[in-house]
Amino acid sequence: MSPGAFRVALLPLFLLVCVTQQKPLQNWEQASPGENAHSSLGLSGAGEEGVFDLQMFLENMKVDFLRSLNLSGIPSQDKTRAEPPQYMIDLYNRYTTDKSSTPASNIVRSFSVEDAISTAATEDFPFQKHILIFNISIPRHEQITRAELRLYVSCQNDVDSTHGLEGSMVVYDVLEDSETWDQATGTKTFLVSQDIRDEGWETLEVSSAVKRWVRADSTTNKNKLEVTVQSHRESCDTLDISVPPGSKNLPFFVVFSNDRSNGTKETRLELKEMIGHEQETMLVKTAKNAYQVAGESQEEEGLDGYTAVGPLLARRKRSTGASSHCQKTSLRVNFEDIGWDSWIIAPKEYDAYECKGGCFFPLADDVTPTKHAIVQTLVHLKFPTKVGKACCVPTKLSPISILYKDDMGVPTLKYHYEGMSVAECGCR
């Protein structure tokens, strides 16, 4: 199993340690992802096998957490100041409150217009014309499923809105071979047209243009759309989209995509393989140590090790209540407390849960003990000072939806971000 997958699988541990220490996450830029397998797991010292460096472990987990969100580091404050479109916040709220609402894609991004050149309508050309400039960037391992252009349409002159609106608009993809970015003569491709009946947000499907832009992956050319708007009603001779700088209703793109890297499935399979290997190794070591200790104990004390099981078990049952057994308990994670509130938009906090309590003999079915956990518990009863109890650990993790800003300040909604909350606890 790769060290990166291991650390991502243990993300809840990283969160829990940071919260319990009540310290902000600092020096992210100093964490280097280029560690070897030994150092990235927090094992330090060539001659000190098994020495665990917690600080190094946490620093490398920070790097992998950011990498799993396609972030190279903590987004700068300057790029995270702009407020995300209300649409993205509404989308997040819908997915988190309505469990039956499932998006077609697991990643949603919004890209605001960067610039616009506008031309007013004339008698010879009765259209409002706009060249909209965007900067669309999607990781290559993601597959775009849909792209929408959202425009706010309104009547720019004072009229009685009760009469409604009547007009149309057409959207073109401005090709890269145009001589200047604000000219589109003869270098545009028709994308979509739409009738206008009411004032408000209009959604136009423009997936083909965005897919072309991403395939081109050009850093020298801007992503350009031409939008023309025409009014068909005399009572509103200036029907137009909202483009003035500072407007709350500026045009923006919404791009839906799926992560094709399949990292969740790969991580789960590798984690399962690693756990199985570790359990087999620990079982062999535990049995070997138990036999050695048993021989020493019987020679020195002349006792049968199993005679202590009954009284020990009785005392253990009397001293432990139901609440001290392995179970899932609440653990609130507040992103402001750990220094992430500048780039994580929502949730502000969530319940990560944690596993607390002991694994006492006999192990109940609700803690889903493995064969190794059962054997380790039995050996612990016989040699409590030599062999530790089985551990109460997460056995199943659940996802949360997270709305955050990436390196470029792009609002990104990741639906079902895996491994962020404990779903079940057990003895391992």
From Swiss-Prot:
GO biological process, one term: positive regulation of cartilage development
Any one Gene Ontology cellular component term annotated for this protein: extracellular space
Cellular localisation: Secreted
Glycosylation sites: 70, 135, 262
Keyword Oxidoreductase tagged: no
Recorded superkingdom: Eukaryota
Signal peptide: 1-22
Xref: Gene3D superfamilies: 2.60.120.970, Cystine-knot cytokines
UniProt-listed InterPro entries: Cystine-knot_cytokine, TGF-b_C, TGF-b_propeptide, TGF-beta-rel, TGFb_CS
Keyword Secreted: yes
PTM (free text): A reversible disulfide bond can be formed between the two subunits in the homodimer; this has no effect on GDF2 activity.
Residues making up the propeptide: 23-318
GO MF annotation list: cytokine activity; growth factor activity; protein serine/threonine kinase activator activity
Cystine bridges: 155-236, 326-392, 355-425, 359-427
Region (Interaction with ENG): 401-415
Keywords from the named record: Angiogenesis, Cleavage on pair of basic residues, Cytokine, Disulfide bond, Glycoprotein, Growth factor, Secreted, Signal
Record PANTHER family: GROWTH_DIFFERENTIATION FACTOR 2 (PTHR11848:SF157), TGF-BETA FAMILY (PTHR11848)
Family affiliation: Belongs to the TGF-beta family.
Record note on quaternary structure: Homodimer; disulfide-linked. Detected in extracellular fluid as mature homodimer, and in complex with its propeptide. Interacts with ACVRL1, BMPR2 and ACVR2B with high affinity (in vitro). Identified in a complex with ACVRL1 and ACVR2B. Has ten times lower affinity for ACVR2A (in vitro). Interacts with ENG, forming a heterotetramer with a 2:2 stoichiometry. Can form a heteromeric complex with ENG and ACVRL1. Interacts with type I receptor ACVR1.
Role, per record: Potent circulating inhibitor of angiogenesis. Signals through the type I activin receptor ACVRL1 but not other Alks. Signaling through SMAD1 in endothelial cells requires TGF-beta coreceptor endoglin/ENG.
Name under which the protein is recorded: Growth/differentiation factor 2
Source species: Mus musculus
